């Protein structure tokens, strides 16, 4: 498999090319989890993998708890579908607690404090209450904890990892910005919250779904993405192949096995796979800098054609422009007259490759504007 085929197959596996997902939920189920610390852009990561989901569609799924936002895996904020969160949280939590141990000690969160903090937060969100971070801080402080700054963040993360709390319905601040809330894990997840999987079964599911949605990729890519050990990923991969030997194939590149779904393999141009109309200018995609097309890989991220996330201009964060699956520039958006009936979106676009033509960029900007549901220019 050459570099062009790797890039094309990744685009297809990640549903950045047809066949696209029917909904944002389906896109998320394919990817299992996506990095989501920048909420509006994470919503776009899901929307652009569908046949037409809008920001409002994704926002409704988040508000209703079908898509949940929480800390797990490396750890950082992730979107996870509520049917996957129970087993993925149970698999990930011990590794994250281990990684957090030094910070727990530094912030005074020993075993007793952590258990009591979990109890305080569980009581705070009981009965269907959705509370902001500031409200959770007030509850912890009322119980005698010095819960601010880093300590507050780790009390909340501890409760997330233990299946006590998870994202609630976002609320709008006075400025119009959406703000995270927290709710009871069991109430948001539902019956699946009480159905844990054996670890081996979870590892097999993790490996099968990671390599199907991000292949071709390496064991190290999966280990770094998931926070699991290389040994656990190898075990999960072996179990997944034992259960379904035809689900994944491998190819060796520079002596390293890359695993992928054979039904998604793309030998043709990554811009326009066989069956699509070919555009000599190439296909442009606007992806967020934490998109899974970037963050889903570590050892083999070089196929992106540049380093991501992108912070190229005066230290200001920018997102990634792809030309046929390879980095070709950077972008960010600005909402003008937010909250008004005449709000519009203006993109700051920096193209690095002279061969990029405006038609492809016009199409990409139009897709983004359709997702936002507002006029969008650059």
Kindly give the residue locations of the regions a language model identified.
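Long, low-complexity intrinsically disordered regions
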Residues: 1-294, 298-300, 305-378
